[in-house]
Amino acid sequence: MLQTNDKLKKIKGDASFRSFYRKSSSKKKSIVVFASKEKEKNLLIYDAINSLLIKNKVLAPKLYSENYKKNYIEIEDFGDDSVFSLLKKNKNQKETLYKKSIDLLGVIQKIKQNRSKNFKGKTYKIPIYDNVKLFNEANLFCEWYAKKFVKKNKLTKFKIDIKKQIRFLLTLLQSKEKVLVHRDFHASNLMKYKNKIGVIDSQDALIGNRAYDLASLIDDVRFKTDKIFKNKIYRYYLKLNKKRVNKATLLSDFEILSILRNMKIIGIFTRLAMRDKKKQYLKLIPYAWKLIELRISNNKKFSELKSLLELNFSKKIRNQK
């Protein structure tokens, strides 16, 4: 619990409505998370998911104290060594860190429970990551990015056509198996702590397609990797899960979800800039386009989407930051 003499130092946050402070006066290292908006998700659900992860031998932040009325929780501090920051310092450890992250993903995807209690003792049932939600997320591309670049006289038709393509891709998803999906399983949310890889920022977790988190990691918009490396990490995941997955199904779902995720990301980053004045994410949009182009070129089933995007978004537009 926070005391009046506690010293708090604000630390860099993320794209959410939360703010983070490092508590320096405690014997234990801790982070205080404040969330006056979306309190239930950012405090109660975050704790419920972390509890589930910890129960299943996944390194996630422990809860130290909470004051829901005052909009905060105090959690374990994993330090500053995210996989992203470690990769920036030394790219030679790239393969090791990515493989350890895939190992962690394997543990998460073996979790069978879909319920967990939060610090108020209430059971939280993790929702399904269904096609409605996937559609609404990909549609952020249309609602925020497209309206910025597609000419007004063409926008209505473009919206109809792109929504049709998103729905078409969703009908092609094949995997019936459902696993715990973190939804932001990328280098910035994976932390090296106590010589292990742990995970943070898990409040948005849902039950869904195993290829989603794999696409989040391999096609991470924040850290560029070449096609050879991406294929190597993909094959490593396949080797670890060969008894659990159908090769063709996994690859098809992976490509589809990577495309839809990066469309979502372009939409979200545009919204952050336009609505919330957080323009620092715009610089990542050109690489999100590169990732879409990489996956879209792999299969004829994406040909209509490819043509539609090429017709409306020139290279000049795609490279704008």
Task: Report residues per predicted region.
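ATP-binding pocket architecture of kinase catalytic cores
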Residues: Y21-N136, V150, Q174
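An alpha-helical support segment within catalytic cores of ATP-dependent transferases
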Residues: M1-L2, Q113, K117-K120, Y124-K125, ...
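ATP-binding glycine-rich phosphate-binding loop
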Residues: Q3-S24
